[in-house]
């Protein structure tokens, strides 16, 4: 059974799906309320709206799925499979960096206590996370000194001939040598350490006071002094710091700043009502979380020729982003604060809060504060994110000139390139052919100047003619309106597309314009007039990376526009896929509700005004299955606290 046939036979309940490549390797894991509807959307988007998803579908040759009982189970299973398989297309944390925990190996004959960043289901007790990170090491050192648990790496599953120095300086009970301590005494020390780590200070104090009095009564004054010193240390520690626990004053607060395709996020860790730490995250380019709104410019009939451009407005979707981010940070973690405050709402916020509550066995407040102190905290996190953005991304600018100078040399330009316009063509076997133009200016993508075109004069598959039409329309208008030509025109394609573009410019009298192209597979740059001398740059060349980035952005915009036009063409026919809906019923539904969107939003009662109840229920069920979470709910970004992605 091929991939498309397998997708058509998927069940309609909730579950998790796994895409595999030709080697049988899992390359992507996702979840869905309705498996068939969600996975089928990949077929409907044969030309995906971003380069990453397009790459996924080009590699995917097989599909597995697992059905579950509800959305909570799907969330948990998806996260678990991502962590186990680490699929290339949706691993979020590049290094799985976490704050440290204190581990107490309760399953061992003689338990040890030490710091770890790796959490396992091994019967041990984990405490934390601790903020800042060095607090965990200070806590463990205090436990070693106070409760005399071993700090060495000696194997305690068997006895040894002699004890180490730690025993003789009274820093260890010596469980490595038989008869130096008793199992009862060691268990008592472990219990003390456990109470201490669990924040049961009052219980520990009472126990120490009783033992101190008993030792004094038995005239064991050295032992009594030890308990006294331990009580003093415990009092001092409780005054200065608090072991991490899940009380009502614990909260994580998020803020973000997005600008020019780059994102900074700040995370405040509030413990006991006080901010104990701050984390920063950075991303550069997040196509998975961009939404576009495009409206064709109004033109008079007499102006139609040379027009038809589409101004594209890209909007960052913070809700979808935070949905993915929070799942990566909190699902299957032993500690989750009772309150998590985010700056924006997202579709599955309540479902995620419910899953985390089941995971932690206490209520989780996952909220978007609107006023008061909580809102002030979110605003403060946002202000800090803006400062982080300034410090991180502004320092990148000095390097930009060096890259521009290198590009100037590579393309033999007389002046430093400040504006590049890049074009790409998209179609499926000649159907709904469209083109995109993206703009790079002074070190950043200038999204306000992006344009998209519907090909009007070319029928069938002819990329060269399509490219010629687009450049003719674009630069005829530039010339008529006396706008400046770009420093470089970049074409996504090979020599054929390059020459077609140059021919269009020459017809407009632009014979000195610099035109270059980049071939997809070879990643070779061709310069018009020097096609026999291709520019081959090193794979790590910043100039090649810049050209690739611009080319990939243009490709993404072209296929996004192509998908939108195809969806507009096919949207009315979607109703015909629903049992009980024929052409007449479809017409009545569209007339009554005004559009497919109106039908999609209607509930069963509203639909019964037009169709019988069984048909209304079928329509509602069909569209309910398509109200799946945003693509990012499966987690489609990488997190790196030290590098720009």
Curated annotation (Swiss-Prot):
<dbReference type="GO" id="GO:0003677">
    <property type="term" value="F:DNA binding"/>
</dbReference>
<dbReference type="InterPro" id="IPR001943">
    <property type="entry name" value="UVR_dom"/>
</dbReference>
<dbReference type="InterPro" id="IPR036876">
    <property type="entry name" value="UVR_dom_sf"/>
</dbReference>
<dbReference type="InterPro" id="IPR035901">
    <property type="entry name" value="GIY-YIG_endonuc_sf"/>
</dbReference>
<dbReference type="InterPro" id="IPR001162">
    <property type="entry name" value="UvrC_RNase_H_dom"/>
</dbReference>
<dbReference type="Pfam" id="PF01541">
    <property type="entry name" value="GIY-YIG"/>
</dbReference>
<keyword id="KW-0228">DNA excision</keyword>
<dbReference type="Pfam" id="PF14520">
    <property type="entry name" value="HHH_5"/>
</dbReference>
<dbReference type="InterPro" id="IPR000305">
    <property type="entry name" value="GIY-YIG_endonuc"/>
</dbReference>
<dbReference type="GO" id="GO:0009380">
    <property type="term" value="C:excinuclease repair complex"/>
</dbReference>
<feature type="domain" description="GIY-YIG">
    <location>
        <begin position="12"/>
        <end position="91"/>
    </location>
</feature>
<dbReference type="Pfam" id="PF02151">
    <property type="entry name" value="UVR"/>
</dbReference>
<dbReference type="InterPro" id="IPR047296">
    <property type="entry name" value="GIY-YIG_UvrC_Cho"/>
</dbReference>
<dbReference type="InterPro" id="IPR038476">
    <property type="entry name" value="UvrC_RNase_H_dom_sf"/>
</dbReference>
<dbReference type="InterPro" id="IPR004791">
    <property type="entry name" value="UvrC"/>
</dbReference>
<keyword id="KW-0267">Excision nuclease</keyword>
<dbReference type="Pfam" id="PF08459">
    <property type="entry name" value="UvrC_RNaseH_dom"/>
</dbReference>
<comment type="function">
    <text>The UvrABC repair system catalyzes the recognition and processing of DNA lesions. UvrC both incises the 5' and 3' sides of the lesion. The N-terminal half is responsible for the 3' incision and the C-terminal half is responsible for the 5' incision.</text>
</comment>
<protein>
    <recommendedName>
        <fullName>UvrABC system protein C</fullName>
    </recommendedName>
</protein>
<keyword id="KW-0234">DNA repair</keyword>
<dbReference type="GO" id="GO:0009381">
    <property type="term" value="F:excinuclease ABC activity"/>
</dbReference>
<keyword id="KW-0742">SOS response</keyword>
<comment type="similarity">
    <text>Belongs to the UvrC family.</text>
</comment>
<comment type="subunit">
    <text>Interacts with UvrB in an incision complex.</text>
</comment>
<dbReference type="Pfam" id="PF22920">
    <property type="entry name" value="UvrC_RNaseH"/>
</dbReference>
<dbReference type="GO" id="GO:0009432">
    <property type="term" value="P:SOS response"/>
</dbReference>
<dbReference type="GO" id="GO:0006289">
    <property type="term" value="P:nucleotide-excision repair"/>
</dbReference>
<dbReference type="InterPro" id="IPR050066">
    <property type="entry name" value="UvrABC_protein_C"/>
</dbReference>
<keyword id="KW-0227">DNA damage</keyword>
<feature type="domain" description="UVR">
    <location>
        <begin position="202"/>
        <end position="237"/>
    </location>
</feature>
<dbReference type="InterPro" id="IPR010994">
    <property type="entry name" value="RuvA_2-like"/>
</dbReference>
<keyword id="KW-0963">Cytoplasm</keyword>
<dbReference type="GO" id="GO:0005737">
    <property type="term" value="C:cytoplasm"/>
</dbReference>
């Amino acid at each position: 059974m091929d991939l498309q046939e397998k997708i058509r036979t998927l069940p309609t309940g909730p579950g998790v799906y796994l895409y595999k490549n030709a080697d049988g390797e899992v390359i992507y894991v996702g979840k869905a309320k309705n498996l068939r509807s969600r996975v089928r959307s990949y077929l409907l988007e044969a030309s995906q709206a971003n380069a990453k998803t397009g790459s996924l579908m080009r590699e995917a040759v097989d599909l597995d799925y697992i059905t579950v009982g509800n959305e909570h189970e799907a969330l948990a299973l998806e996260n678990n499979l991502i962590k186990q398989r680490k699929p290339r297309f949706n691993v979020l944390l590049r290094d799985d960096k976490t704050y440290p925990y204190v581990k107490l190996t309760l399953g061992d004959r003689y338990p040890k206590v030490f710091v770890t960043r790796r959490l396992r289901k091994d019967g041990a007790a984990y405490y934390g996370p601790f903020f800042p990170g060095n607090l965990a090491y200070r806590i463990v050192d205090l436990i070693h000194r106070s409760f005399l648990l071993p700090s060495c790496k000696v194997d305690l599953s068997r006895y040894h001939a002699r004890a180490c120095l730690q025993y003789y300086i009274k820093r260890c009970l010596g469980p490595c040598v038989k008869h130096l301590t008793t199992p009862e005494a060691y268990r008592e020390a472990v219990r003390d350490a456990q109470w201490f780590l669990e924040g049961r200070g009052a219980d520990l104090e009472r126990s120490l006071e009783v033992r101190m009095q008993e030792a004094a009564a038995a005239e064991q004054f050295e032992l009594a002094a030890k308990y006294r010193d331990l009580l003093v240390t415990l009092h001092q520690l409780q005054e200065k710091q608090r072991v991490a626990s899940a009380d009502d004053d614990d909260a994580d607060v998020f803020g973000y700043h997005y600008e020019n395709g780059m994102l900074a996020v700040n995370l405040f860790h509030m413990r006991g009502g006080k901010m104990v730490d701050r984390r920063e995250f950075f991303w550069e380019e997040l196509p998975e979380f961009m939404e576009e709104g495009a409206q064709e410019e109004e033109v008079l009939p007499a102006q139609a020729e040379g027009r038809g451009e589409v101004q594209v407005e890209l909007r960052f979707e913070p809700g979808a982003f935070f949905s993915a981010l929070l799942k990566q940070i909190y699902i299957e973690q032993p500690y989750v604060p009772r309150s998590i405050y985010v700056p924006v709402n997202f579709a599955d916020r309540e479902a995620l809060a419910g899953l985390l509550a089941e995971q932690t066995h206490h209520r989780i407040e996952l909220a978007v504060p609107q006023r008061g102190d909580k809102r002030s905290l979110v605003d403060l996190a946002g202000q800090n994110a803006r400062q982080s953005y300034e410090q991180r991304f502004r320092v990148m600018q000095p390097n930009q000139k060096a890259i521009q100078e290198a590009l100037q040399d590579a393309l033999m330009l007389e002046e430093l390139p400040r504006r590049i316009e890049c074009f790409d063509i998209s179609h499926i076997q000649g159907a709904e052919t469209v083109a995109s133009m993206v703009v790079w200016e002074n070190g950043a993508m200038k999204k306000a100047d992006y344009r998209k075109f519907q090909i009007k004069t070319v029928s069938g598959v002819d990329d060269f003619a399509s490219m010629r039409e687009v450049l003719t329309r674009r630069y005829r208008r530039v010339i008529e309106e006396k706008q400046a030509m770009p420093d470089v025109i970049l074409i996504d394609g090979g020599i054929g597309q390059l020459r077609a573009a140059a021919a269009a410019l020459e017809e407009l009298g632009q014979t000195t314009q610099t035109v270059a192209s980049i071939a997809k597979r070879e990643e070779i740059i061709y310069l018009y007039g020097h096609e026999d001398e291709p520019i081959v740059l090193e794979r790590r060349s910043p100039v090649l990376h810049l050209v690739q980035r611009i080319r990939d952005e243009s490709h993404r915009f072209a296929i996004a526009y192509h998908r939108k036009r195809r969806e507009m063409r096919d949207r009315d026919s979607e109703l015909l896929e629903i049992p009980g809906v024929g052409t007449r019923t479809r017409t009545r539904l569209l007339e009554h509700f005004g559009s497919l969107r109106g039908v999609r939003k209607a509930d069963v009662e509203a639909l019964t005004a037009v169709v019988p109840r069984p048909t209304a229920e079928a329509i509602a069920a069909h569209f309910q299955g398509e109200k799946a979470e945003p693509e990012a709910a499966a987690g489609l970004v990488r997190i790196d606290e030290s590098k720009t992605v």
